[in-house]
Amino acid sequence: MKKLFCIIALAGIALTAWSQKPLRLSTYNGTSVERYDGQQCDVTADRYLFTGWNTISLPFAMTEQELDEALGQGVKLERLVGVTQQGNEIVLNFQDCKAEGIKANQPYILYYPGETSSKKFSANAQVVNKESKMTLTTSGGVEVTMSGAAFKTDGKGLYGILAINNVDANFTYIDNEKGFFYATRCYISIPGEQQFTLTPRHWAAGEVTSINDIAAANDIIDVYNVLGVRVAHNIKAGDVNNLDPNIYIVKGRKILVK
């Protein structure tokens, strides 16, 4: 009986060790993580980062502390929370979310203040095998999708942050056959033939509030987009949350509709 117990115990230890075995992700061609889905692993991804704004999407989560340890406390992490259109220009509203850490398969922009070099992203975390993608729609009906590349992806017809144009996180349209995105990078896609100018705006975590903090539900208000264009007139404050996800201006305050 004791021998049987020991065998079972050793099997359990071996299973635990296997479930947490090292997993190194390719940040060039990409790595299939399907067979690791839901498993706790010691995951590592060596990413080349440029000084300035980069993009990142990982199939595992990292805490704020782990991010600071990997890149330094000056790093910034932002997620897309809204899109605002005026003619051919689309404003990409990014909000600071570093306190939340990196969530698995969430597309982000990341500001790296250090020297251009390869950096190690690592964590003992659950691997998640799912598509990294989010879609927001402008008031003009244009769908803007930000996606993370799990594998090396053809870039023609997509928008991305180029190393030569990353001071302000500008997403540039790629119109040649030689453009591509390496794994763990992010890109933006917009359906149709029309090319847009994408302008990033960065919002601090505490710079944006909710409508409940500035108005009672039955208060009658006007709502403006971040370009100063009125998008709703004489509506109840409680109805603001029915608007498309974005950042709006109400009574001079910035509010976030999720």
Where are these regions (language model features)?
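Solvent-exposed beta-hairpin/edge-strand motifs
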Residues: E64-Q85
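Sec-dependent signal peptide recognition
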Residues: K2-I8
